Amino acid sequence: MLPRPYIFSHNDGPSSHLFQHVLPHNVSQQQRIEAHLNSTNNFIGPPMNAPRFIPTYQWTPVELSDVACSPNGPMGNNRKRRIQDNSDINLKRQRFSCPSPHNQSARNSNFTSQPVTRPVTGREVTCPTCSSATFIPGGCVPSLGETCHQNAFSPSSVKDKLSQQILNLFFACEQQSDDLEKKESCRAALQTDIQKIFPCAKVFLGGSSLNGFGSRSSDADLCLVIEEGPVNHRKDAVYVLSLVRKLLYKLSYIEKPQLIRAKVPIVKFRDRISGVEFDLNFNNTVGIRNTFLLRTYAFVEKRVRPLVLVIKKWANHHCINDASRGTLSSYTLVLMVLHYLQTLPEPVIPCLQRDYPTCFDPKMDIHLVPSGPSDIPAFVSRNQSSLGDLFLGFLRYYATVFKWDKQVISVRMARTLPKSNCKEWKDKFICVEEPFNRTNTARAVHERMKFEAIKAAFIESHRLLQLRKDLNFILPKSKQMARPQTAPR
């Protein structure tokens, strides 16, 4: 194991177990020195020879166009000479990089293990997750980046005004393929730069960017993975992310990097080229798992995505959709919608973790997670309620039916659980179970005033919508296209 005082002299250094995989025993003394210089000086230098413990980002269709990359990184000084691919010097350089992914057996036949690289200027990279790909036979979940509306609503099939308003808002605001391309381009560039200090690290895109519930104005969630396993967030994550933040300050395409020391620490930053806001966490792989669980729910029934999008817009307008300010995160809101749709007398959606347990196994290798639900068929519900009726029913459920003081929302079980089952949950205002690690996703709501504001929004919006049947009375047109509010930095 690497002696911590040698490489990491920081007072708040990481736990020793974390970096034994970053710098293995077979790394030479010279390579350790290079890694140390990369992390303490200007983060510049050739990658050390370390085994690829975290395989290359594999969530890309097989058909990939090659992307040329300049030999100089974004911080390069342009003094390196250009070298032919077949030169002796280049062959020598390859011996000091991670093993080629082509020497590894494919983990999934539908995804390639080719890395995505980035040009220095302009960053015009073809988004690998948006390349053309066919649907897997029998599966309801489209390939990553698929732009067509599978089983989409026909505008003429929607009769009532409220449903039409919801559908119009959905089509106007849903994330487009070019939005995803911008996020993927920054992800690929960032992974290349982070590998200068953590050669075997991978950066994964997740959250609403991939789960089917993103809008054109959605931020992007990134997960930095160095080794898969439990992390001491107070020590390991904060330390690693502090190194990453120092790196981001030196990258010309990144603006305003800020370390947020939350229960799950993140680095917030902005991509100068696309203007997209990013949240980067460290080793929070449960976020990758729930991304593809939610993606399956998004496409298993055609009414789910429009309903979730309008509810997120509504919650943002009423200032109850910001965990950093003590209200509900977007993830919690999505789980609340799914729970409501699961627990209707005639469910609109199934309970995926109960019906397809092997597809969402919490122990599944993280690189197989995207293909887990690939063969799950579309759900045919007997409940044919309109979008308008479902939205009104959602507001009614949380305004008058759900018992906040006694019940826990569980999408994993497709029912409510009693708070008394868990002593840690008894004094929480809102309890929403995370489907994989079973923590409370609504833990940010810890002030009674914020809790009462959330309940009041449901009660008043339900009253108005029941009376008017018009979306504009609870979500004005001027706010429907607004970017989600975020806490000031």
From Swiss-Prot:
One of its GO terms (biological process) is negative regulation of miRNA catabolic process. It is an enzyme of class 2 (transferase). Keywords: ATP-binding, Cytoplasm, Magnesium, Manganese, Metal-binding, mRNA processing, Nucleotide-binding, Transferase. GO terms for molecular function: ATP binding; metal ion binding; poly(A) RNA polymerase activity. Residues 386-440 form the PAP-associated domain. Its EC number is 2.7.7.19. Residues 100-116 have a biased composition (Polar residues). It is found in: Cytoplasm. Gene3D superfamilies: 1.10.1410.10, Beta Polymerase, domain 2 (3.30.460.10). Residues 93-118 are annotated as: Disordered. Pfam families: MTPAP-like_central, PAP_assoc. InterPro entries: MTPAP-like_central (IPR054708), NT_sf (IPR043519), PAP_assoc (IPR002058). Its cofactor is Mg(2+); Mn(2+). It catalyses: RNA(n) + ATP = RNA(n)-3'-adenine ribonucleotide + diphosphate. One of its GO terms (cellular component) is cytoplasm. Mg(2+) binds at residues 219, 221. It comes from the Eukaryota. Cytoplasmic poly(A) RNA polymerase that adds successive AMP monomers to the 3'-end of specific RNAs, forming a poly(A) tail. In contrast to the canonical nuclear poly(A) RNA polymerase, it only adds poly(A) to selected cytoplasmic mRNAs. May not play a role in replication-dependent histone mRNA degradation. Belongs to the DNA polymerase type-B-like family. GLD2 subfamily. This is Poly(A) RNA polymerase GLD2.
